[in-house]
C-alpha cells in the first residue's frame, strides 16, 4: 500500500517487485490454466486513467483486453432523456457492479463475454454489445472500480491515478464537449453538483486499496515500469 501518497519511481520499483513476489505462485498457477491476470486502473474523472490503460493496450494489442467501467451504467429506459441527463452518474448506485463481477469471472474461466455499450449522447445503454476475449491480461478502468469489494477482489493488481483537480476538470470538459456533444454550462453544472462531491465522497477514498498510486496518467516512468511488469507476466505464459 502507498498510504494514499504518490510514489517515487524508486518506490514504484519496490512495489512492483513486492507485487511480483507476492503473486508469483498464484500467477504461475493461473498461467498453467491460461487464466487472465486482471489489472484495475482507477482514479477521478479526467485523471488520465483511460489514457494510461489505452497505452498499455496499444503496447500489447493481442495480449490485453480492455474493459471500461463506463459501459456498465444501469439502463434507464423508463426515464425521459432530459431527466436522464440530470442523474448522478458518479455515485456507486449508478453502476451494475454485479454484471462486472460476473463477466470478469467468466473471463477468468476462459469464456468470452458480451460487454454492454453505454451511449453518452442518450445517457443510456445502447442495444449494442462488445465481445471481450479472455486474453492473458484484462485491464478494467473506471472511477469506482475499487469501491465494490467483490469487484476489487477480482483484481490481481490495483493502480490508482492521482491528478490535480484543475487538470481533471479541464480534461473532462474537453472530452464531454468534443466526444459526448455536451455544452460547457452543462459540464460545469454536473461537475459542481455531482462529479466533485462524489469524487471526494466515493472515488478519492478508494485509493487506500491501491497497490500502486501514480502521479498523473502521463507518468512515463510509471508507464514503463507497469509495461515491464505486464511483459513478465506474458513471458510466464510461454
What are these regions (language model features)?
Residues 11, 15-18, 24, 30:
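Short, positively charged and aromatic/hydrophobic N-terminal segments
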Residues 79-120:
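Conserved nucleotide-sensing/catalytic segment adjacent to the nucleotide-binding pocket
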Residues 133-134, 196-238:
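NTP-dependent small-molecule kinase module
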Residues 44:
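P-loop (Walker A) phosphate-binding loop of NTP-binding proteins
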Residues 52:
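Hydrophobic positions on the alpha1 helix immediately C-terminal to the Walker A/P-loop
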Residues 62-77:
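Short beta-strand-centered segment that lines the nucleotide-binding/catalytic pocket of NTP-utilizing
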Residues 126-178:
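ATP-dependent NMP and nucleoside kinases share a basic, alpha-helical "lid"
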Residues 49:
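Conserved lysine of the Walker
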Amino acid at each position: 500500500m502507498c498510504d494514499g501518497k504518490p510514489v517515487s519511481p524508486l518506490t514504484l520499483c519496490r512495489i512492483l517487485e513486492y507485487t511480483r513476489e507476492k503473486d508469483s505462485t498464484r500467477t504461475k498457477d493461473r498461467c498453467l490454466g491460461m487464466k487472465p491476470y486482471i489489472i484495475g486502473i482507477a482514479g477521478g474523472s479526467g485523471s488520465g486513467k483511460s489514457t494510461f490503460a489505452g497505452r498499455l493496450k496499444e503496447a500489447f494489442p493481442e495480449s490485453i483486453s480492455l474493459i471500461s467501467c463506463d459501459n456498465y451504467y444501469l439502463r434507464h429506459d423508463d426515464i425521459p432523456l432530459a431527466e436522464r441527463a440530470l442523474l448522478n452518474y458518479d455515485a456507486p448506485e449508478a453502476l451494475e457492479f454485479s454484471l462486472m463481477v460476473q463477466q470478469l469471472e467468466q473471463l477468468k474461466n476462459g469464456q468470452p463475454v458480451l460487454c454492454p455499450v453505454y451511449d453518452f449522447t442518450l445517457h443510456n445503454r445502447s442495444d449494442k454489445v462488445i465481445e471481450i476475449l479472455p486474453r492473458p491480461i484484462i485491464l478494467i478502468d473506471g472511477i469506482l472500480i475499487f469501491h465494490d469489494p467483490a469487484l476489487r477482489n477480482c483484481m490481481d493488481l490495483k493502480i490508482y491515478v492521482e491528478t490535480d483537480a484543475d487538470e481533471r476538470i479541464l480534461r473532462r470538459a474537453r472530452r464531454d464537449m468534443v466526444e459526448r456533444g455536451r455544452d460547457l454550462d452543462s459540464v460545469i453544472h454536473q461537475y459542481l453538483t455531482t462529479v466533485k462531491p462524489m469524487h471526494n465522497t466515493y472515488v478519492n477514498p478508494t485509493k487506500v486499496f491501491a497497490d500502486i498510486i501514480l502521479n498523473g496518467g502521463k507518468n512515463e516512468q510509471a508507464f514503463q515500469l507497469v509495461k515491464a511488469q505486464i511483459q513478465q507476466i506474458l513471458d510466464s505464459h510461454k
